[in-house]
Regions:
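A short hydrophobic beta-strand element
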Residues: 120-130
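A short, structured loop/turn motif at beta-sheet edges
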Residues: 114-122, 150-156
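N-terminal secretory signal peptides that target proteins for export/translocation
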Residues: 1-19
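Short beta-strand edge/turn micro-motifs at domain boundaries
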Residues: 143-170
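A solvent-exposed, acidic/Ser-Thr-rich amphipathic alpha-helical stretch
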Residues: 45, 63-117, 141
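Short, cysteine-centered beta-strand-loop-beta hairpins and adjacent loop/turn segments enriched
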Residues: 102, 130-140, 168
C-alpha cells in the first residue's frame, strides 16, 4: 500500500491518517445531520400553520380561505362517511353545503403528529371533535382521527387529501 507523504514507513502514520479521515467524515456527517434538523423543523412549523389556517377557515365557514388551502387538482381526495370526493371543485361544493348547517372542528393539539414523508410531502394526524348538524337539526359531536396529506407547491403547503376516521363510541 502506498503511504501518504506525511506517513511513517512503520504504519503508525498510516493508522493515524486513516483515523483522521474517518473522523473528518464522521464530523461532516454529524454537521450535515444537524443542518437538516432545522429544515425539517421549519417544514413542520409551516405544515402546522397551514393546518391551523385550515381549521380556522372551516370554523369561519370561509369557503374562499378553504379553497386557497386545498390542492387545486382533480386528484384531491376527501373521504367522508365512506364516500370519496374527488377533485378540488367537488370538495368545495360539499363544504359549501355543510356550511349551511352546523360545522365546527375542535382539534386536540396535544395529539398532533406531523410526519415528513419527503421534502415536499407531510402527513398530519390529530384527534379532533367535529360538531356537525344539518340546517334546522340539533348538532352532534363526534370524535374523529383526522388524517391529512399536505404537499408543498410554489404557493406554499396545500391539503391534498383528507381522511377523517370516526372513533367508535366507548
Amino acid at each position: 500500500m502506498k503511504a501518504w507523504p506525511n506517513e511513517k514507513k512503520n504504519g503508525t502514520g498510516l493508522y493515524r491518517s486513516r483515523f483522521a479521515r474517518i473522523l473528518i467524515a464522521y464530523m461532516a456527517l454529524m454537521f450535515l445531520s444537524l443542518a437538516t434538523k432545522p429544515a425539517i423543523a421549519a417544514a413542520e412549523d409551516e405544515v402546522r400553520a397551514t393546518f391551523d389556517r385550515f381549521v380556522a377557515a372551516q370554523n369561519a365557514h370561509d369557503i374562499k380561505a378553504v379553497e386557497s388551502l386545498l390542492l387545486s387538482s382533480p386528484d384531491f381526495l376527501w373521504i367522508t362517511r365512506g364516500t370519496p370526493i374527488w377533485g378540488h371543485d367537488a370538495a368545495l361544493k360539499r363544504f359549501t353545503a355543510l356550511y349551511d348547517g352546523t360545522w365546527r372542528l375542535d382539534p386536540e393539539p396535544s395529539g398532533l403528529k406531523i410526519t415528513m414523508i419527503s421534502d415536499g410531502v407531510a402527513q398530519v394526524y390529530i384527534p379532533i371533535i367535529f360538531t356537525i348538524g344539518a340546517t334546522g337539526q340539533a348538532a352532534q359531536q363526534t370524535k374523529f382521527l383526522m388524517n391529512q396529506v399536505l404537499v408543498k407547491t410554489a404557493d406554499g403547503w396545500r391539503v391534498s387529501s383528507i381522511l377523517p376516521i370516526p372513533v367508535p363510541p366507548q
